[in-house]
């Protein structure tokens, strides 16, 4: 990894802004900004400081050549540190609420929801209503909360990821919103804003049966497996609505089953997320999506380890 990538990974892990990192390194904001924008190269003394901070933050004893390899190794170390991520979340009400809030707010906002994070919190945890917001948006928040609660309990029993679970999650998410909640679509759909062909509705049950079998196959590279499954699910687009939300819940089910923190895909990363997904679906290149998921899981670990950004 070059020094720019080391700094970027330090930022991602710690949540520190550029001012704070500059202070830690003993340089000006302007100097750090020049390094990050490839307009200058750190002097040898600062290269040593960057590497020292990188090793301190990551807990590694070396700097990896490849950024994605460094992130993957960091994830493995965090898995070893957190012996049971799911139980850790469930046994800590504040942490659990933060995951439910972050996952619900971001997932709904990615799909066009207009509730703020504070409004989402008030609806979910205090049963507040906002006259300026639609009843559907209120239901989307409460339903996503219910889906996560159901999912956490389901995973505690070490139950398999199967079609029954996928249909149940859709039923919960679309309860009171769509009449086809809990059923595969029986009509054609297209992915808005993407030139990606979706499956013929007649083939959906067969494709989902195959997908459910593949979800539970063991893989040496968990993140690669998750990226492939997520890409396939979203291209099948098995439901009339709610595919993105269900897909991200399945992604986090797979991650939690392998003792990873949930992937928190932030609304501000929406375009990058869609771009990575598009490359996986049209070019069969899952590497960008894998890297994106790695970053999103690291966001989840910030909640798990109480690092705020």
Language-model segments: what does each one mean?
Residues 1-241, 245-309:
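FIC/Doc superfamily catalytic core
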């Amino acid at each position: 990894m070059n020094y720019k990538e080391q700094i970027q990974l330090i930022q991602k892990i710690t949540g520190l802004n550029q001012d704070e990192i500059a202070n830690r390194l003993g340089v000006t904001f302007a100097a750090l900004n020049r390094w990050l924008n490839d307009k200058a190269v750190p002097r040898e003394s600062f290269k040593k400081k960057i590497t020292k901070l990188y090793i301190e933050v990551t807990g590694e004893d070396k700097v990896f050549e490849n950024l994605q390899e460094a992130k993957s190794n960091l994830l493995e170390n965090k898995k070893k540190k957190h012996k049971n991520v799911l139980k850790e979340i469930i046994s800590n009400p504040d942490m659990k609420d933060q995951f439910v809030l972050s996952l619900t707010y971001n997932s709904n906002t990615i799909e066009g929801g207009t509730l703020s994070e504070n409004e989402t919190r008030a609806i979910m945890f205090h049963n507040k209503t906002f006259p300026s917001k639609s009843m559907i948006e209120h239901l989307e928040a409460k339903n996503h909360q219910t889906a996560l609660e159901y999912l956490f309990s389901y995973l505690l029993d070490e139950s398999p990821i199967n079609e029954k679970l996928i249909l149940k999650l859709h039923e919960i998410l679309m309860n009171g919103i769509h009449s086809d909640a809990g059923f595969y679509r029986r009509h054609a759909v297209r992915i808005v804003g993407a030139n990606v062909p979706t499956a013929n509705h007649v083939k959906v049950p067969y494709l989902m049966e195959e997908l459910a079998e593949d979800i539970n196959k063991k893989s040496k590279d968990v993140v690669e497996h998750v990226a492939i499954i997520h890409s396939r699910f979203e291209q099948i687009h098995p439901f009339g609505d709610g595919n993105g939300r269900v897909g991200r819940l399945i992604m986090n089910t797979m991650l939690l089953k392998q003792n990873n923190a949930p992937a928190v895909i932030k609304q501000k990363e929406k375009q990058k997320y869609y771009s990575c997904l598009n490359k996986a679906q049209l070019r069969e290149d899952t590497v960008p999506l894998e890297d994106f998921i790695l970053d999103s899981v690291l966001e989840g670990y910030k909640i798990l380890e109480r690092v705020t950004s």
